[in-house]
């Protein structure tokens, strides 16, 4: 889990655009964040299996 201070630090407007980075809105993870959903791949997988993300289902071919 991310420290609360890192979440607050990331939420502030940065002076330079390259300092901005995405964090998972659910767990605060800074890596592998899907911008479209605003959550990391781990939370995305969990929510998709639970059916909490509408229109998402497991692929099979």
From Swiss-Prot:
Q: Name one GO molecular function term.
A: rRNA binding
| PROSITE patterns the record matches | RIBOSOMAL_S14
Q: Which Pfam families match?
A: Ribosomal_S14 (PF00253)
Question: Which annotated residues bind Zn(2+)?
Answer: 24, 27, 40, 43
Query: Record's Gene Ontology CC terms?
Result: cytoplasm; small ribosomal subunit
> Is this entry keyworded DNA repair?
no
Record-linked InterPro entries: Ribosomal_uS14 (IPR001209), Ribosomal_uS14_bact (IPR023053), Ribosomal_uS14_CS (IPR018271), Ribosomal_uS14_sf (IPR043140)
Give the co-factor note: Binds 1 zinc ion per subunit.
List keywords of the entry alphabetically.
Metal-binding, Ribonucleoprotein, Ribosomal protein, RNA-binding, rRNA-binding, Zinc
SUPFAM superfamilies, per this entry? Glucocorticoid receptor-like (DNA-binding domain)
Q: Is Zinc-finger given among the entry's keywords?
A: no
**What cofactor is needed?**
Zn(2+)
Name a biological process GO annotation: translation
PANTHER family listed in its UniProt record: 30S RIBOSOMAL PROTEIN S14, SMALL RIBOSOMAL SUBUNIT PROTEIN US14M
Protein family membership: Belongs to the universal ribosomal protein uS14 family. Zinc-binding uS14 subfamily.
Function as written in the Swiss-Prot or TrEMBL entry: Binds 16S rRNA, required for the assembly of 30S particles and may also be responsible for determining the conformation of the 16S rRNA at the A site.
Q: Subunit structure of this entry? A: Part of the 30S ribosomal subunit. Contacts proteins S3 and S10.
What name goes with this protein? Small ribosomal subunit protein uS14
Species of origin: Mycoplasma capricolum subsp. capricolum (strain California kid / ATCC 27343 / NCTC 10154)
| Gene from which the chain derives | rpsZ
């Amino acid at each position: 889990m991310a420290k609360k201070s890192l979440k607050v630090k990331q939420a502030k407007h940065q002076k330079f655009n390259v300092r901005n980075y995405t964090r998972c809105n659910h767990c605060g993870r800074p890596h592998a964040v899907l911008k479209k959903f605003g959550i990391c791949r781990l939370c995305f997988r969990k929510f998709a299996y639970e059916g909490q993300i509408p229109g998402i289902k497991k692929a099979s071919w």
